[in-house]
Amino acid sequence: MSMVYMNIMLAFTMSLIGLLMYRSHLMSSLLCLEGMMLSLFVMASLMILSTHFTLASMMPIILLVFAACEAALGLALLVMISNTYGTDYVQNLNLLQC
């Protein structure tokens, strides 16, 4: 396995660990999710280019479209939560609290 693939896997792992550790603020969770999506995009693009599998060449573009939709929804939710509660804590998203 080359160093490029190892670095991309390390970036994905670090983003996943960051998502698991810093899940109290919504902004840090969104940044970690974006890091995970970016590393998945780069990994998918490199895999398709290295195997010359042209039938799946649209997969990274579709992944980027879903990542952009996820980012837009996440930022809209962040703005709504910060305007309503004044903070970006994820615990404010719990609908079961009184």
UniProtKB/Swiss-Prot annotation:
Topology class, membrane: Multi-pass membrane protein
Record EC number: 7.1.1.2
Coiled-coil ranges per UniProt: none
GO cellular component, one term: respiratory chain complex I
Compartments, as annotated in UniProt: Mitochondrion inner membrane
GO biological process, one term: ATP synthesis coupled electron transport
UniProt-listed Pfam families: Oxidored_q2
Transmembrane segments: 1-21, 29-49, 61-81
Primary location: mitochondrion
Keywords tagged on the record: Electron transport, Membrane, Mitochondrion, Mitochondrion inner membrane, NAD, Respiratory chain, Translocase, Transmembrane, Transmembrane helix, Transport, Ubiquinone
GO MF, any single term: NADH dehydrogenase (ubiquinone) activity
Subunit (UniProt): Core subunit of respiratory chain NADH dehydrogenase (Complex I) which is composed of 45 different subunits.
Family: Belongs to the complex I subunit 4L family.
Function: Core subunit of the mitochondrial membrane respiratory chain NADH dehydrogenase (Complex I) which catalyzes electron transfer from NADH through the respiratory chain, using ubiquinone as an electron acceptor. Part of the enzyme membrane arm which is embedded in the lipid bilayer and involved in proton translocation.
Protein name per the record: NADH-ubiquinone oxidoreductase chain 4L
Organism whose genome encodes this protein: Vicugna pacos
Top-level taxonomy: Eukaryota, Metazoa, Chordata, Craniata, Vertebrata
